């Protein structure tokens, strides 16, 4: 008999097209050992130590330092701490540490915990690649692995209230003429080459706007976006929740769209670790991964949403009002543009359902191809080779099998196939050059 009871296994199963978010937290065997954790940032509940990490499967170490940014998609790392999942899998001393910006996250990953930095992080999916290649580390590579995707969807593109009369949505075309009337119009994102940079560039380019010609980009840390829009530092910005909803709730801007409307179930954040840490501590890496995966399942249960948002709102985590987090976590959208509030669980942030946790290699290949599109990476970049080096979907599969995730919930291929964007453009991971050729606006460098 497996580690699941039969009833638990039935509850754990997801139906492929379910609109409601379901799932169940995994359970251990009988006669468990109980541990209480209290180290690191945040609090933890008592948890039974899983038999999956006993004896020869015990982690090599009991601690790791993991970074996070105050964004709702960091929830799995935080919930794994608060609910004692790290302890459950033999890692009671894990620290989950707030980072001021993605640049800080990068710098601390390069340092590593032995030098006062961190071992892994909640991170923009392209960043482990840019760090591994040395692109954003002054040419000094720091090899990293992606162990899981943390979420899909859940980001927003906002505009200042002075653009509200344009009623801009997925079609950004009306902004071209409006931006032309502004001296040096700026749009903000959170890290060059990161997901938010890619979303806002794609959206504006689809509307006929060219970076460097029709607008320039600036970097603003997520938690500083709302303050910057209040002083009119930019015309538009892209960032993850809860900051889009906070912008609306404070009445300082409105939302044009949520990124699931650009690309349904698009990949977003990753659980990234330094490669040397994983290679030196393979059992501990698996334990961390199992803890994060269980937290993802917990986060996607509808009955846990309010508790999740209450936890995230705490001073030690986000220090943000509960009201700025909860609606978007339930798929409820008020864009602050005068239109009716609507509910859509298909485009909302997901952590586990619809294979949200599995790190498809094809998605990482798109991010690298898009970085080529905008000149962050040379056209000669061997995207497949670097994806095969960084993306450790094999470790995800190993953890999923240990947790007895049903086989039909483990993707049969590391590719999700051809992806279609809101403007009809398609990306075939087997032919990324065809995608680049199809784009009218790009800045490809040799």
UniProtKB/Swiss-Prot annotation:
Transmembrane segments: none
Chain residues carrying a lipid of type S-diacylglycerol cysteine: 29
Keyword Membrane recorded: yes
Annotated keywords: Cell inner membrane, Cell membrane, Ion transport, Lipoprotein, Membrane, Nitrate assimilation, Palmitate, Signal, Transport
InterPro entries: Chitinase_insertion_sf, NrtA/CpmA_ABC-bd_dom, TAT_signal
Signal sequence segment: 1-28
Residues engaged in binding nitrate: 102, 155, 196, 240, 269
Annotated localization: Cell inner membrane
Lipidated residues (N-palmitoyl cysteine): 29
Main location: membrane
CDD domains per the UniProt record, alphabetical: PBP2_NrtA_CpmA_like (cd13553)
Any one biological process term the GO annotation gives: monoatomic ion transport
UniProt comment concerning the protein's domains: Composed of two domains (I and II) organized with a C-clamp shape.
Purpose: Part of the ABC transporter complex NrtABCD involved in nitrate uptake. The complex is probably also involved in nitrite transport. NrtA is the substrate-binding protein. Binds nitrate.
Quaternary structure note: The complex is composed of two ATP-binding proteins (NrtC and NrtD), two transmembrane proteins (NrtB) and a solute-binding protein (NrtA).
UniProt-recorded name of the protein: Nitrate/nitrite binding protein NrtA
Name of the gene: nrtA
